[in-house]
Amino acid sequence: MSAPPVTERALVLRIAASGESFHKIDILTAESGTFLCLKRLSKNRSQSTDPDLFDTADIQLDTSKQGTARFVKDYQLVHRHSAIGQSYRKLQHASDFCALIAQNGPHMADPAALYHITERTLDAFAERALPAIVFLKAIYILLKDEGYPVREAWWPELPATLRQSAKQLIYPPTPNSATPEQLEACAQISRNLCRWLRRETDLILPNSLA
């Protein structure tokens, strides 16, 4: 006998086709963390029932009798981050961040904290004009929240020429404008931080960042 359906508020991290009848959806909930579920493609598709990347939705889930798969029984859209899809750079950076969460979330200790960070990050991607800076801040905050010594170990390794820029980019609220020099510094700092993450942590970078 299968377990009774449960409803959880979820963030949609990734969507991929699974045959002709289903979507594979990586979601994150504050209660259960990240996991993969399947949603049957509806013949009467509508904007509110068809999942989209970065959605916030109330999802009712059925577990298979074998307990190995979870299926979406009902999908109620709460909020759609439509602005992310209107910018290639926003879409790229948000997809990279969500792929990182989807791949590593099952091994992270506090799903509620992870949900909060991811929700705030998606809001920032949608609302702010500089997704590269949002991405840098999000990776730094994620590492710090997971207990990795970014301040103690990564910061001293960062080239001295980039430290002042890093302070200006990471700590204040994300600005809506930046000079070309600031954006180039942001790209260098992000690459440096991702190299440190790959070398010094047990997190797995998605292929797009490796």
Set out the residue ranges of the language-model regions.
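Non-catalytic alpha-helical scaffolds and adjoining flexible linkers that form interface surfaces
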Residues: 1-23, 28-210
